[in-house]
Amino acid sequence: MRVNADFSQRIVVRPRPEDWVASPQPGVTRLMLDRVGAEVARATSLVRYAPRSTFPAHTHGGGEEILVLDGTFSDEFGDHPPGTYFRNPPGTSHAPRTEEGCLLFVKLWQFAPGDTAAVRIETRGGAWLPGRTHGLEVMPLHEHQGVSTALVRWAPGTQFPAHTHPGGEEILVLEGTLEDEEGAYPAGTWLRNPRFSRHAPFSREGALIYVKVGHLGAPALGDAITA
């Protein structure tokens, strides 16, 4: 299966109700943002668990990255409330469940070779650092060999200078509206800007975004998955 699998293309996804599809596990649906592979896949998805859903214990051969967007996601290691960011490195396993239901942003098989760090951050209590331009605050989440992941908070009226992303950029708009010369991206929008793309983003109303840079074209454990 291939969904938005040409990583040289700019992709903008504004999720619609009809975009959600059932997974093999009852009570779990997903919206595929990009995907290469069948059930073992290099994948970026939104995943929704219905209340009282469970998922069988499984191992992540290529690692798993999760941001909890809504509800409480649980496994044998604890309860993970909204805003929790974690990385389960290659070879780790767990048995997910949820009592109230939850919505997750999930990336699979995208760990770099040699990246073995386990990460868990409750971002709603995390520290914010000054950004590179007035009106921006940044909460770093992870960095490995030039691939960086962070939350970025935009105050209303913030303008970022035009810049180029040699290693590409991926954004999930969590709150507010982000804009650039190509359009406006309200909360829930997912964007993938290819390598060497250029833009001048801004936010008139303010925004909170998840952003990953430097990963397109960088080595990942899922590179060997082709279909």
Describe the role of every protein-language-model region:
Residues V28, S53, A57, R132-T149, ...:
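Catalytic core of non-heme Fe(II) oxygenases with the double-stranded beta-helix
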Residues A50-P51, H60-D75, H165-E181, A187:
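Glycine- and acidic-residue-biased ligand/ion/polar-headgroup-sensing regions
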